[in-house]
Amino acid sequence: MDLVVLMQNARLQLKPFWPLSVAVCLVYGILIGVPSELNTYGELLSILLAGPLQLGLCIYFLKICNGINPSLSNLFEGFKPLLNVLLAFIIINALTLLGLFFLLVPGIIISLGFSMTYYIIAEHPEMQFNEALECSWKMMDGHKRELFSLHLRFLPWYLIGLLFFVIGVFLVIPWHNLSIASYYQAIKKNNINDR
């Protein structure tokens, strides 16, 4: 897959939605970041919000991929299959931390292997979290290095964004997210049977 073309197409798709996408990512960041700074209960609240909001972010960017006008409310659609999403979030993060405990590379591999879980749940909300995890792992078989490379391609853009007093980073985050959603769309065709 040509990652440069994927990134260019994502940037073109994002153009009419860039201000809204920046706002969605900003709201996501505030809802995840602010409670954890308050106190111990705030950290717990952040953990409880992280999975559903991550799913909402995936729903938002998948809408753009599918040519559907997104809205800020998409960010909160991840709360509908709440238990399913929370269990997926806990398992993904526990396994990633376990992998990172042993070495950096296993943690990265585990994270990449489960990286499509939220997209799968977004498109198949009836799917149980363990099925979505398994499906993501199978889907990413042979694609982890390519996805890692896609993430690395955004590193210079984030660094350039930092040069512009961090404001530029807020322009890169939606582009990065849409590129990952587009990557999911590209690889899912061979891996998920439509239900």
Task: Describe these PLM feature segments.
Residues 1-31, 69-98, 110-162, 192-195:
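Interfacial aromatic "cap" segments that immediately flank transmembrane helices
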Residues 38-69, 97-129, 158-193:
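Selective recognition of hydrophobic, aromatic-rich stretches within alpha-helical transmembrane segments
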